[in-house]
Every structure is written in C-alpha cells, then in structure tokens.
C-alpha cells in the first residue's frame, strides 16, 4: 500500500469516526424513567386469590421493579419518556453521566433485590403476597394523581 492510499484510508476512517461520534451525540436522549417500566393491569383481591403462587411472585417482582425505578424520580417525572432537556435540565456531560450512573445503580439494586426475592420470597404466605401486590398497586395508582399536588 503506498502513502497516498494510506492517507486516503486514514481520512475515510477519521471521517467515519467523526460521523459516528456526532450521530451518537445527536441521538435520542435517555429518559429519566425508562420506557419498560409500566404496569399493564391492576388486580382485584379475588383475581389474585385464584392465581398460583408462581404467578403472584412474578406480579410482585414486576411491581417492585416499577416502584424502584419510578418513586425515587417522582420529583422529575412519573411517566416514562421525560428527558432532562424536557425538564429544562442542561444536557451537559456531567448531567448525562449522573443520569447514567443513577440508571446503572438502580438497575444493579433491582437485580440484587430480585436475586434475594427469588431465594426468599417463595417462603412467604400467599395471603401476604396478595396484600403486598395490592398495596404496591395502590401506591402505583396514586402516581396518576401526583400532578394534583402541584
């Protein structure tokens, strides 16, 4: 490969890297609350009583996930899709890093909680699981009225 070919190749590679970096920077901003955090259905006690314990464990863990990922952030948002910029928070490197670290810490905490729950939660009474699910669901329903307090 001659010098001209090497320079051309280097130029093309640098242009691609620059384009990729700009595309990453101009990409969609991460949400304060991720889009996968939602409850598709709320339940009545009678419906929960008809479920098997394994189904209740899954519901319980999903509600824990939503609570862990939403409640610490309700001063900013109660629904997925809200970004720092949409709240008027400057989109600085420091703020993006802080959000990423918070998201990672929340994910790690949830994974550790889930690991513990998988070991210990099967020993819980079905009636306690049902009561906890109903309590968590009522808590999550209250988020729909959060804006009423502003």
Regions from the PLM with identified roles:
Residues 109-150:
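C-terminal amphipathic alpha-helix
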Residues 22-72, 76, 150:
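Immediate post-signal-peptide N-terminus of mature secreted/exported proteins
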Residues 61-64, 68, 103, 133, ...:
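Generic structural concept
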Residues 68-115:
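Mid-chain, structured segments of secreted extracytoplasmic proteins
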Residues 34, 38, 45, 52, ...:
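A generic structural signal for ordered alpha-helices
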Residues 17, 76, 81-83, 122, ...:
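Generic preference for flexible, low-structure residues
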Residues 52-63, 91-94, 98, 121-124, ...:
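Non-transmembrane, amphipathic alpha-helical segments
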């Amino acid at each position: 490969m001659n010098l001209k070919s090497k320079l051309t190749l280097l130029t093309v590679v640098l242009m691609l890297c620059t384009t990729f970096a700009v595309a990453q920077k101009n990409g969609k901003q991460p949400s304060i609350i991720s889009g996968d955090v939602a409850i598709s259905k709320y339940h009545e006690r009678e419906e929960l009583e008809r479920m098997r314990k394994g189904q209740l464990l899954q519901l319980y863990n999903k509600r824990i996930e939503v609570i862990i990922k939403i409640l610490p952030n309700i001063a900013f948002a109660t629904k997925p899709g809200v970004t720092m910029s949409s709240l008027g928070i400057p989109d600085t490197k420091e703020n993006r890093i802080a959000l990423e670290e918070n998201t990672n810490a929340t994910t790690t905490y949830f994974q550790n909680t889930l690991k513990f729950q998988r070991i210990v939660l099967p020993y819980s009474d079905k009636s306690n699981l049902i009561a906890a699910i109903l309590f968590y669901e009522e808590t999550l329903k209250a988020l729909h009225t959060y804006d009423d307090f502003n």
